[in-house]
Regions:
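A charged, well-structured terminal subsegment
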Residues: 142-149
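Short secondary-structure capping/turn micro-motifs that flank functional sites
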Residues: 48-50, 73-74, 95-96, 115-117, ...
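Conserved N-terminal beta1-alpha1 strand-loop-helix module at the mouth
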Residues: 1-85, 102, 151, 162-163, ...
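Catalytic cores of alpha/beta
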Residues: 72-82, 115-123, 140, 160-176
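Short hydrophobic/aromatic-enriched beta-strand-loop microsegments
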Residues: 63-67, 85-91, 106-110, 127-132, ...
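Glycine-rich phosphate-binding active-site loops on the catalytic face of alpha/beta enzymes
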Residues: 86, 90-96, 129-139, 173-193
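Glycine-rich beta-to-alpha transition loops that act as phosphate-gripper elements at the mouths
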Residues: 19-22, 67-73, 89-93, 109-114, ...
Length: 205
């Protein structure tokens, strides 16, 4: 599936941010999330199994599987080789951004201040992850930050909850939010995951 970053961000109001240790859990979790209405799945490269988890999740019809916590071009290449359909980074560097742009993959780098955004704009990027959202000042900070950059849109991630997500999604510059609350740690409770996904999919303001 070939999508641009805008389409990835608009596919659902919440992108589950997934930290999965056991590849055996990957496909069932992906099925529950997609069934609940959250097709865009960000698998963070924070576990040794992450690349295998992505490969397993891609078996699920309708799943749009990407890699998060991508820090450098080597990790980008590994994620692409595993079939990542989009790439999310916690920050913005010229080296990683240029490699991602050259690959053609939808790319969502992290920003936390105006200088980050301006570096992104210099590279032709206008879609960003606002991270860490709550630690960086929350919604008031993003509103102030977004004001000079009307062409930019954001996916706030970090400390956002099911309760606070609607307020973020009501802000025009926010296309979606990243959420780790949808899938808990440990052995998955698939019914609970699908229920949480349904609730998250209904959050679009």
């Amino acid at each position: 599936m070939s999508m641009n970053v805008e389409a990835v961000m608009r596919a659902a109001p919440v992108i589950p941010v997934l930290v999965i240790d056991d590849p055996a859990h990957a496909e069932p979790i992906a099925r529950a999330l997609v069934a609940g209405g959250l097709p865009v799945l960000e698998v963070t490269l924070r576990t040794a199994a992450a690349l295998e988890v992505m490969t397993e999740m891609k078996r699920v019809p309708g799943a749009i599987v990407g890699a998060g916590t991508v820090l450098d071009p080597a990790q980008l290449d590994a994620a692409l080789a595993a079939g990542a359909e989009f790439i999310v980074a916690p920050g913005l560097t010229e080296r990683l951004s240029q490699a991602a742009i050259a690959s053609g993959v939808p790319f969502l780098p992290g920003i936390a201040n105006a200088s980050d955004i301006m570096r992104g704009l210099d590279l032709g990027l206008t879609r960003f992850k606002f991270f860490p959202a709550m630690a960086s000042g929350g919604l008031p900070a993003l509103k102030a930050l977004a004001a000079p950059f009307g062409q930019c849109r954001f996916c706030p991630t970090g400390g956002i909850t099911e309760a606070s997500a609607p307020e973020w999604l009501a802000f025009d510059a926010v296309l979606c939010v990243g959420g780790s609350w949808v899938v808990g740690k440990g052995a998955p409770d698939l019914a609970a995951i699908e229920k949480a996904a349904c609730a998250a999919a209904a959050l679009r303001a």
